[in-house]
């Protein structure tokens, strides 16, 4: 039973940036289809900067815990420069306390362990998107 509910303005689409291998993109798209989320897929870290330059706005960024070389820091930097900054979900084969606390310290939202079920992915994306909306709403009221 899917209990994920997005609490966002019905006039605004929920957008997700997903840095995932090409062979997994179809599965992610299917797992998120019932949420009505618009997903922009990239398969290489360098492609994230191209999207950032276009000033695309995302509720959530789905990033792998491991990237070759220093790609992870570069991607994190690009994501951090997006305004507003999306909530970052990091996926990994295992979630250690060190990884989870490191992600939170860097300003990420959460870590999800793969392989994840449709329900697990939907729940994580929903919570992150709702957190994004709440944070942006608070920021708007603080101005």
Predicted regions: what they are:
Residues 1-9, 13, 130-143:
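CheY-like receiver
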Residues 21-43:
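Two-component/phosphorelay signaling modules centered on CheY-like receiver
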Residues 25, 49, 58-85, 92:
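Conserved phosphotransfer microenvironments
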Residues 45-51:
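Short alpha-helical segment
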Residues 80, 101-105:
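Alpha4-beta5-alpha5 "output face"
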Residues 116-125:
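C-terminal output helix
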């Amino acid at each position: 039973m899917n209990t994920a509910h997005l609490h966002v303005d019905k006039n605004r689409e929920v957008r997700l940036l997903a840095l995932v291998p090409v062979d997994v993109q179809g599965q992610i798209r299917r797992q998120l289809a019932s949420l009505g989320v618009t997903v922009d897929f990239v398969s290489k870290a360098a492609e994230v900067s191209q999207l950032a330059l276009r000033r695309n706005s995302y509720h959530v960024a789905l990033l792998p815990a491991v990237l070759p070389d220093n790609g992870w820091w570069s991607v994190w930097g690009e994501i951090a420069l997006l305004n507003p900054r999306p909530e970052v979900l990091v996926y990994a084969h295992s979630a250690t306390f060190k990884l989870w606390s490191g992600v939170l310290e860097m300003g990420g939202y959460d870590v999800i362990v793969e392989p994840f079920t449709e329900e697990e992915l939907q729940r994580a994306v929903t919570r992150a998107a709702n957190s994004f909306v709440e944070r942006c709403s608070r920021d708007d009221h603080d101005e």
